[in-house]
Structure formats: C-alpha cells, structure tokens
Amino acid sequence: MTGRDAAVRLADEALAGLADAAARVPGARVPGPRGGFGLLGERGEVVGEERWTDRSCRLLRTADGWIAVNLARADDLDLLPAWLDLEVGVQESVWDRVADAVAGRDAIAVVEQGQLLGMAVARVPAPEEVTEGDVQLMSRRMVPPGGSHVRIVVRPPAVTPPAATAFVVDLSSLWAGPLCGRLLAELGLHVVKVESTTRPDGTRLGSPEFFGRLNGDKGHLGLPLATAAGRAELRRLVSRADIVIEGSRPRALAQMGIDPAAVVRARPGVTWVSITAYGRTGPWCQRVGFGDDAAAAGGLVDRGADGAPALVGDAIADPLAGVVAAAAVARAHADGGGVVLDVALREVARVAALRAEASTAAGAA
C-alpha cells in the first residue's frame, strides 16, 4: 500500500463517520456515499497538474537524513540569510543553493534553527524510527495507538438534542479548516467564515474556483482584527457559536484574548476544533507547518529503491486533516459537545504512514 492509498482509506473512513454522525443530528442532511480520493486531490483538479512542476516544498538531503523545506510565503526567501547564511542572486536557483547549504548540516539542528525563524521546515523520520522516542508525540500521548486527534472533555455534554441549525464560526484559512467547515455546511449547519480585513485568507491569492469550493456555501464576515474593537467583536461572535473551527497556533489565540477551553466551558453543547501543524500542546505547539512538510514530518512519504523520500499527493496532510476534523466535530456535536478537539496535520499524516508501513511489512513477510 502506498502512502497515498493509506491516506485515501483514512479519508474514506472519516467520510463514513461523518455520515453516521449526521444521521444522529435531527434535521441534518446525511451525505451520500463519497470517496476520499477526490477530496484529497481536489486542488489539483481545479488548478491543473502544472502546479506540480514548481511546488513550494522540497525534500532535501542533510548530513544525517532528510528534511522538508517549504518556501510557501513570499517573505520566506528573506529569511534564508538568517537561517543558512545564504544570499541568493537573481539568476541563481534558490533550491540548488538551499540544497547545497543543508547538505552538510545536522537535520535536527537545521530544522530547529529554521523553526525559530518561523519557517516551515521539518525533519523526515526514517522508516525504522521508533515513534515512542518522539518528544512531541510522547507529550501528547499520540504514540501507538494514539489515534488521529486529541479529544479533551471540558464539560458534560448538553442534555438537549443537537441541532442541524447549529451556528459554526470558521476562523480558519488555507485548506484543512475551510474544508472542515465546508463539509459541515453540506450537512446543513450554518457556517460563517470570518476573516481579518487586513490579512484575509491566503487561499484568495490562488485559484478563485478553489477558494469558492472551500467557502462558497458559507456566510462571510470581515473584521478589523488589528483593532481592539475588531477583537472584541470576534470574542462576542465566538461566544455565540455552537461550533468553532480555527487553525491558529496557541500564542495567536491568546493574543486575541480567546481561550478555547473557557469558551466551551461557558455554555452547554459547544464543540471547538483546532487544526494546526503540530497540535495545540507539546514542545512543538508553536511550530509552523503546511500540508506537504507536515505530511513529511509524519513520515507520510513514498520511498524509491534507494530509500530517498518523495512527497505524497498535493499538500496531502491538509485535506486529510480537514476530513478527519469534520468527522470528529460531527461526532462530538451529535454527542452533545463540551469538548475541545485538537487535530494536528502531522499526526493525521502519521496514522496514514503507519498503515502504509504496516501494509508493506505484511506484504514482505
């Protein structure tokens, strides 16, 4: 089984779970049969396969392994001098220079240096590595059989039946969180996408059709989150929500004056889902990550005959985490809420990677 096959199967299971949960919510639209393959490759379907020739993430060899480097943002290039003491000329290949610079360095050290600068860089674990030695997974109790997300019970579930008219506030951006919100909107829930008026969702800079697919069935609200008044309005909106979707690192939420557990504790039936690269807790909770590098950090890569890793799919941890999160939210809502769900792209990818490795080992036995 390839990494992509394992990811598709995990997405299929999540979609089935989403439908089962919807059937327990009075008035919700129960989705018909749907495969995960299409959702995981949806962006490529919309924007075309030519994007593969110039993707922002590469897997690069270091002195003792491999790392994923994702230069997805325009200002990432400005950080290269501080990260690698590297100046890139106009006529030079950025990737050739970066590859040369990391080739003689220790993978863990170069990743830590990049992350301190806010760069989306990650070490790719070797197939034989024991996950029980991973400090982030151990701190989050996500070593086997840890599962695909952390579920924290904050208060007893609501006594009143869940409603299909639930109010969902979607604070997320890019792919994973918006996909989660879209899948909930398809059940009939009222989803409102909230964006900063000064820093809107970065997906708007890409394909309008893809942005529309993720967010077309939602209401939209822009708030001046750089102002105290805008942040106060955001807190009022969140306090009215039955479900909140967000993808911010813990530090960013705290700066907004928002505590997920406090929001859930304040009112019966509330479900909060956080979808981040490495999770809300643990020593890596403030690390930056996107779909490709987070998947590689979870070991969800394909390997050639020489053992060299290759990226799987298109930012595959993003849509996979979005589907897993939607199923988890639907189950929690059907059960009466009262929980904070913590979904990490890396951990969702890791579940698929472990399945692929187990299948390969079984086939070789």
Segments (PLM) and residue ranges:
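Short, well-ordered alpha-helix to beta-strand connector turns
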Residues: 188, 217-218, 241, 290
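Acyl-CoA thioester-binding alpha/beta core of soluble enzymes
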Residues: 1-202, 208, 228-243, 260-281, ...
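N-terminal glycine-rich dinucleotide-binding loop that anchors FAD/FMN and/or NAD(P) in oxidoreductases
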Residues: 208-226, 296
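Short glycine-biased active-site loop of nucleotidyltransferases that positions the nucleotide triphosphate
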Residues: 212-213, 264, 284-286
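Short beta-alpha connecting loops at secondary-structure transitions
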Residues: 218, 311-314
